[in-house]
Amino acid sequence: MISNFLKSNNIKNNSPFRSFCTRYSESHEWIKFNHRNKTCTLGITKYASDQLKSIVNINLPDLNSTITRKQPFGNIESTKTVADLFSDVDGKAVLLNSDVIVDPTIVSHSPEDKGWLIKMESNDFESFNKMMTKSEYGQFLKDINKSNV
């Protein structure tokens, strides 16, 4: 019964009864959504971190800033380039990872754990559910690698 509900509402492998679920964007950010308290944690993927190489500076939004889906909310500067940061969900910044602001190399070493960037309040489950699952993101990366050969 639940699986029929999920299929009919186009919810990808995301039981509404799970507390945490992580999704990935085409711009190589990840979002871990806590459905119970309607917060999410956002960071960049290992792939993005590897592409940037040496991260030297991170600019994040002010606390309580509105984060608009698909609009830049900050950037990461490396020795190679400056890359904008995007969220695939709307929300409000409620916590910034001050550790990565002081020591940006944390993102290089632990992009999907200690290198998280911001925590947001969000009710944007619909946009979150449109993001890629881990397996879909893995296939997305394989397709990128094929096109770069």
Swiss-Prot record:
Alphabetical GO biological process terms: glycine decarboxylation via glycine cleavage system
GO CC terms: glycine cleavage complex; mitochondrion
SUPFAM superfamilies (alphabetical): Single hybrid motif
UniProt remark on cofactor binding: Binds 1 lipoyl cofactor covalently.
InterPro entries, alphabetized: Biotin_lipoyl (IPR000089), GCV_H (IPR002930), GCV_H/Fam206 (IPR033753), Single_hybrid_motif (IPR011053)
Stretches assigned to the Lipoyl-binding domain: 39-121
Cofactor(s) the record lists: (R)-lipoate
Swiss-Prot/TrEMBL keywords: Lipoyl
Modified residues (N6-lipoyllysine): 80
Known role: The glycine cleavage system catalyzes the degradation of glycine. The H protein shuttles the methylamine group of glycine from the P protein to the T protein.
Similarity section: Belongs to the GcvH family.
Subunit structure: The glycine cleavage system is composed of four proteins: P, T, L and H.
Protein name: Putative glycine cleavage system H protein 3
Gene source species: Dictyostelium discoideum
